[in-house]
Amino acid sequence: MFFNKKNNQDELKKLAATEAAKSITTEITLGVGTGSTVGFLIEELVNYRDKIKTVVSSSEDSTRKLKALGFDVVDLNYAGEIDLYIDGADECNNHKELIKGGGAALTREKICVAAAKKFICIIDESKKVNTLGNFPLPIEVIPMARSYVARQIVKLGGQPVYREQTITDNGNVILDVYNLKIDNPLKLETELNQITGVVTNGIFALKPADTVIMATKDSNIVVL
């Protein structure tokens, strides 16, 4: 019997997403994130359609998927405050601080987190780490500032790599930063955001997850 790692990971992502959906309450304004784990959440939302008053999406990709299932997606400017925002992460530490942005939607995701009363992060066990930084840190950058920002990141000890053929939903570019050991996520998030030309970076420490729902390799759910 062959062990298919991808299929098993997909099952865990679906397990975490299904568990998170149980937090959906009646007349809720729901924020929906971006990425492969959220893809399973979107599929699960059809079972909660009667409870959802309004849906806000963090990316054009998620908006397309939601509309394909018959959901009306509302701009955050009209929705106001989000009751619950559910999203995945590329890494999560013991303090529920995250690295996000592998799908290049980090700025809109960070806006949704800021506007949400509660943020639930859904992950499989492979995303849990002691120290953030193994996954390259995405930074959204104004295009004309790309080289300047890259030079400033080098001064901080990082190795920036331009993510080619990627334009964010906001019309910007992504630098993925390698070789950063992020011992103080809060400090680095603030420091990077102060570089002129940076829109935002993928550290979520100023507003970490309120709750993390993690599916373990033995198909159990752990709530952090």
From Swiss-Prot:
It catalyses: aldehydo-D-ribose 5-phosphate = D-ribulose 5-phosphate. Its EC number is 5.3.1.6. The keyword Isomerase applies. This is Ribose-5-phosphate isomerase A. The lineage of its organism: Bacteria, Pseudomonadati, Pseudomonadota, Gammaproteobacteria, Thiotrichales. It is an enzyme of class 5 (isomerase). It comes from Francisella tularensis subsp. novicida (strain U112). Homodimer. GO terms for biological process: D-ribose metabolic process; pentose-phosphate shunt, non-oxidative branch. One of its GO terms (cellular component) is cytosol. PANTHER family: RIBOSE-5-PHOSPHATE ISOMERASE (PTHR11934:SF0). GO terms for molecular function: ribose-5-phosphate isomerase activity. The gene is rpiA.
